[in-house]
Design a protein with these regions (language model features):
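Adenosine-cofactor binding site in Rossmann-like domains, unifying the SAM/SAH pocket
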Residues: 35-79, 83, 92-95
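Eukaryotic short linear interaction motifs
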Residues: 35-39, 58-61, 90-91, 122-126, ...
């Protein structure tokens, strides 16, 4: 989002994504979609074709689009990279955050990449989410974590995930047609004390 691009929020996350991509994604498979500034990837047009979207676009080159309303039939298995940079934390409902992750897996090709950026307190100081639970949620919808970065006392956590090959039952899972473990579908307290209430539910 444009707010998250500010230096007071941690700066442009595309720098981390571009640092990680070489060696993980063939140059011919550089298409990405995410919520970014329109010129974030201009220097990399030789191998990246990106389509920036935002719920309320403030720039003519950013498509105004609700990620949760993207047509599944025409986009399933069509994307190589999806960047959800400071996006999940702006989705109001915990279950819609889970739906966004399921849709991301639906839209990605097998072995595609999902880049997630969250405010660090969403993972380190949440009553309902820690890194282990985030890993479980991602695995349940078909992702494995390949890279993670954060600084102790920092503002953000960066997570890069690989879309794993799905079985027939797994293909139903990321579409929400198969039951998930109960600890991933309802809020379960993981920490006590003064915490925030950020959660992701499937």
């Amino acid at each position: 989002s444009s707010i998250g691009q500010g230096s007071d929020r941690g700066g442009g996350s595309e720098k981390v994504l571009l640092e990680w991509l070489p060696g993980l994604l063939p140059e011919t498979h550089g298409k990405g979609k995410g919520k970014e500034k329109p010129d974030n990837y201009d220097r990399y047009r030789s191998w990246i074709s990106n389509t920036p979207i935002d719920l309320r676009s403030r720039h003519p080159q950013i498509k105004e689009q609700d990620f949760l309303q993207i047509d599944v039939a025409t986009n399933a298995g069509q994307w190589d990279v999806i960047s959800l940079s400071l996006v999940l934390n702006f989705v109001p409902q915990a279950r819609d955050r889970g739906k966004m992750l399921r849709l991301a897996r639906t839209f990605l090709r097998n072995r595609g990449l999902l880049f997630i950026v969250l405010p660090l307190p969403c993972v380190q100081n949440s009553r309902y989410l820690d890194f282990q639970r985030l890993t479980q949620i991602l695995a349940a919808v078909g992702f494995s974590i390949v890279k993670e970065r954060h600084k102790q006392g920092g503002k953000l956590i960066y997570v890069l995930c690989r879309a794993e090959q799905l079985s027939v039952s797994g293909e139903q899972t990321h579409l929400g047609e198969e039951a998930f473990p109960p600890e991933l579908t309802a809020k379960r307290s993981l920490r006590t004390g003064d915490r925030n209430n950020f959660a992701i539910l499937l």
